[in-house]
Structures are given as structure tokens and as C-alpha cells.
């Protein structure tokens, strides 16, 4: 019985570690890569002379929405408060994504490759949110009023992620943000606001 209990504890700890590694070393890089691929698709579609600054501003809005949840997960204790903000930003991001595609439709060609990339950009934030929920299931249940007391305070992590990992994620975010700022600048120079 005792060996079974220890085995179960080790297995649960292993699942938690694997989930965290999956979030940090798979989901986040795939998300950043999809952001780069989407920018490249916009560039190939000549966005500055088609949908212009309006669509580009929508892209930066989506970056800000996803960045809020990412920064909270990177630096703050994940609890009911952080999960609630994450769920809210995910919902807003999905609505903004619908606005993005609706606006682009008829203004520029959205190729099958770009549509495929959009699939990643929509699903990867959901994957990240789901993994964060699984890792902090007690607070997810508490936030839903199912069990325990929710902690709504936004506060720094008790056990911060490594400096190297935080620096890497911030650098990736900065690089992708820079691409979309370049896109907006290119669109503004071309002077295409709303064709």
C-alpha cells in the first residue's frame, strides 16, 4: 500500500512536470513560430497596399491581448485571479480573431497557408490556457465555485521561473512584436487605412 502511494505521488509529480515542460518548451515556441509565419504571410499578401493599417492594428491588438496572459503566467502566481484574466483575454482574443478575418475578407487574399497558420494562432492559446488550468486545477475549481477558496490576488510567483527562460520568452515576444510594429509602419507609410 505504501509503495503504491509513493508510486502515485511520483507519477503525479511526473505528469505535472511533463505538463509544465510541454507548455514552456513546446506550446510557447510553436505559438511564437506561428506569429512569425503569420507576419510573413501578411507581407507576401502585400498587406500595406490591400487591407492596410486597420488590419495591422487589429494584429497588434491581438498581440497585446495574448501578451497580457503570457506576462501574467511568466511573472505572477497562477491562481484564480490570473486564470480569470487568462480566460477573459482568450475570449477577447478569439473575438478579435473573428474581426481580423472578417476585415481581411475581400480586401486581400488570405492563402490556404495563412489559413493553416491561423489555425495554430487560434488553437495554441487554447492549449496554453488548458495546460495552465490543469497545472492549477485547485484554483480553477475554486474560481468556478466548485471546491476550495479562490485566490484572486495578482502577485509575484513564489517560485519564479528561471531567469534564462523568462529572458528567452521576453526576447521571443519582443521579436514577434517588432515584426508587427514593422508591419504597421509599412502600412502607415503606404497610406492605406481602409480601402
For the regions a protein language model found, what residue spans apply to each?
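Short amphipathic, positively biased membrane-proximal segments
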Residues: 1-195
Amino acid at each position: 500500500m505504501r509503495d503504491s502511494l509513493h508510486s502515485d505521488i511520483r507519477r503525479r509529480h511526473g505528469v505535472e512536470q511533463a505538463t509544465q515542460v510541454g507548455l514552456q518548451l513546446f506550446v510557447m515556441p510553436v505559438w511564437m513560430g506561428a506569429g512569425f509565419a503569420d507576419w510573413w504571410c501578411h507581407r507576401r499578401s502585400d498587406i500595406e497596399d490591400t487591407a492596410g493599417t486597420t488590419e495591422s492594428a487589429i494584429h497588434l491588438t491581438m498581440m497585446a491581448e495574448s501578451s497580457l496572459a503570457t506576462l501574467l503566467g511568466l511573472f505572477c502566481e497562477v491562481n484564480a485571479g490570473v486564470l480569470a484574466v487568462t480566460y477573459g483575454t482568450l475570449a477577447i482574443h478569439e473575438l478579435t480573431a473573428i474581426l481580423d478575418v472578417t476585415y481581411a475578407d475581400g480586401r486581400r487574399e488570405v492563402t490556404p497557408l495563412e489559413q493553416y497558420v491561423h489555425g495554430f494562432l487560434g488553437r495554441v492559446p487554447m492549449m496554453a490556457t488548458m495546460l495552465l488550468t490543469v497545472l492549477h486545477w485547485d484554483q480553477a475549481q475554486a474560481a468556478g465555485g466548485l471546491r476550495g477558496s479562490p485566490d484572486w490576488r495578482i502577485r509575484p510567483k513564489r517560485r519564479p521561473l528561471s531567469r534564462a527562460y523568462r529572458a528567452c520568452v521576453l526576447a521571443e515576444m519582443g521579436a514577434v512584436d517588432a515584426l508587427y510594429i514593422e508591419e504597421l509602419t509599412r502600412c502607415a507609410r503606404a497610406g492605406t487605412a481602409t480601402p
